[in-house]
Amino acid sequence: MNRPVRWVTYASLGLAGLVAALGLVVVAYGAYLATFLALPKSDEHPPLHLYSGPFLLQPDLLLVHSHLLERLQRLGYRRVTLPVQAPGDYQLTDEALTVYLHPQPEGHVGATMVTLRLNQGRVTDVLSPLDGTPLFHIFLEPELLSGVRGESRQMREWIPLAQIPPQIVETVLTIEDRRFYSHFGIDPVAVGRALWINFTKGGVVQGGSTITQQLAKNLFYSPRRTMGRKFKEALAALVLEVKYTKQDILESYLNEIYLGQAGFVSIFGVGEAAHRYFGKTLQELTVEEVAMIAGLIKGPNSYAPTKHPEPAKQRRDVVLRRLRETGLLTEEAWKRAKDEPVRVTPSEDVLTDAPYFVDAVLHQVEEAGVVPLPEGLRIDSTLDPMIQQAATESLEKGLAKLEALHPHLTSALESVQGAVVVLDPQSGSVLALVGGRDYRRSQFNRAVQARRQPGSLFKPFVYLAALEAAREGQAGQLTAASLLVDEPVTFESETGTWSPQNYDKQFHGPVTMRNALEQSFNVPAVRAAKTLGTKPIVQLLHRLGVTSAIGDDLSSVALGSSSVSLMEITAAYGAVANGGVAVKPAAVRSTRDRRGDIIWNAVPDRQQAVSPQGAYVLTSLLEGVIQRGTASKARAIGLQGSVAGKTGTTDGYRDAWFVGYTSDVVIGVWVGFDDERALRLTGSQAALPIWMDLAGRIIPPTVPAFVMPPGIVARTIDPKTGQLATSQCPEQVSEVFIEGTEPSVYCEVHGGGIWERLKHTFGFP
């Protein structure tokens, strides 16, 4: 009898000791957690700040086209009638604009006064108003574009609990933790209820976590579902309940809860959600909008109203029904709220002015190795806010006009899309980037992520490769005056025979390279690529900055049936505009930590991809495209001077392109459908009008000529023969050549020209 009693006693003592030991471990671990677990404060998470590029104040600026006065207003400058006296003042007269510039601590520049002398709206001199001496390298300070938060690329507006409307607090507590004020961090009733429901439903359909547990998980632990993590989460909740008041915990929860995405940036907190989804403050939200935000907590991405409006409405209605059941909503208010459709009207703030650009910047910073993004990081970008605004407006207006003119574009399930890229060809700076029609509907960046066939945009590079071959004396060489045969031809390919056709279904006989490119004839381009070989053309494209894979068949190379991004092809044309120097596009200039110390400085990645002479001749050919060719209507916007460009239309009319440039700026435009259905429009019809509208806004009316490099000669030729013209030739044109490749034979068709031949033979001028 004593042995069993003794055994039970020992077992009980052992179990009690084990429980006590486990209790001590738990207490010790809890004490350990208490030393470092802390709720965030509103000032503990300084945002990441993204700034535009600086704006150089220099002679020849036009007040209208540079939008200088608008820039001053956006930066908070005040126009005064008296002489400027304080930083932020500016005075404008017919003769001068005097600005008292704000200090720029990041550039170690103090407040500075500067006078821009004017002549009919054009800046003639940049001077010091104190002594009249010329000033150089004077910049307007960068504009703050966006404030996001570091490591998770978060947007969060911290709002004290006292400023959060009771309706929001009550709604969140009703749907997430009805017993918040009565439990101690863990709610046994909720856990038991969840276990029973999950058991009866045969799966996990409901959780039992309290708001305190959710906060602990979000702040301190990974989202992995393991027993160990659940134990730590529960213990952390207990510690938080001991260390902080219920009000502290609730305030942190409402400001830290994850509520969805705005592109690559995470939305945290009810205040930011109200701002991003509805463009409102918390005080302005309706009951159904409050229910929508509260419903997001369960599945921010599954119930996002911007992407999944129907599931979002269903979840919202669940919340509304719960509010009615608990008496927080009357029957009448519930019926009115549930009948409201889902309306999402995000704020039109600086982030939505350039959202695709912001995404591209964050991606480039992370590619540079600044990972994770530190809190308080400052990113100095290359964006020009006024050009960005113009690009956005031109794309929106242009696509709307296309739909009005061509009703078949509106019959599709998806809207026609477009993208715009604006680069500085000399520095590679991305001045503007619009990746789609509506960022709120689709965050897919068509300017950098989409790969589409460029069509005729590849033709200039076929001819550029041939010009370079001529310069180097290699096989396949051609000049701008070379005759190319535009007649029916059949080629053998891996898939059988192939006979290229021109857009107009006609053949035009022998044509010069210039005429073939101006009119975008297909057959001459294919013949030139066949003669030269595709390998040099592919290599040239890669040197110019095209990183996408390019097929080595004739169709891929000559007619652009390989896929590239708008950014790549725009950069390739930028290299031509820059005298053959390819500069990798960059959206970021530098990054600094919260102390102002530089973390990373962008170093331009540049190389001489082609000769300055080859680039100049090709630019001359592309000027002809705008003067006489497929883009001749571009002159309607009144541009005078040197502008070059090329239209692009893909097989089946799925994509429409135009890339045009001056020596200072290159603009690329793409129009098409995301699902690659036929657009049934050419580049001249769909993309060129958008380019024209944007160019008319940002390019001055008078454009300086492209600088002719040494090694270029001009000759008068007969375009019918491509030979030197004689006095008997009925048509004579001036053509440019790389020195050493110019024709030496006089026209053999029209005769005459004895005097010209004698001068050429004996070297007379």
Task: Write out the residue ranges for each language-model feature.
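Juxtamembrane regions of bacterial inner-membrane/periplasmic proteins
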Residues: 1-404, 429-431, 487, 527, ...
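Bacterial peptidoglycan biogenesis and beta-lactam-recognition machinery
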Residues: 77-78, 164-167, 176-187, 200-205, ...
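Short pre-catalytic segments that frame enzyme active sites
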Residues: 124-157, 268-273, 301-305, 334-335, ...
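Conserved catalytic neighborhood of penicillin-recognizing serine enzymes
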Residues: 197-225, 280-283, 347-353, 357, ...
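Short, conserved loop/turn and helix-capping segments at secondary-structure boundaries
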Residues: 309-313, 448-456, 507, 612, ...
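A penicillin-recognizing enzyme superfamily signal
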Residues: 381-411, 417-424, 433-434, 438-444, ...
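Short, low-complexity, Pro/Ser/Thr/Gly-rich segments in the mature regions of secreted, periplasmic
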Residues: 754-764
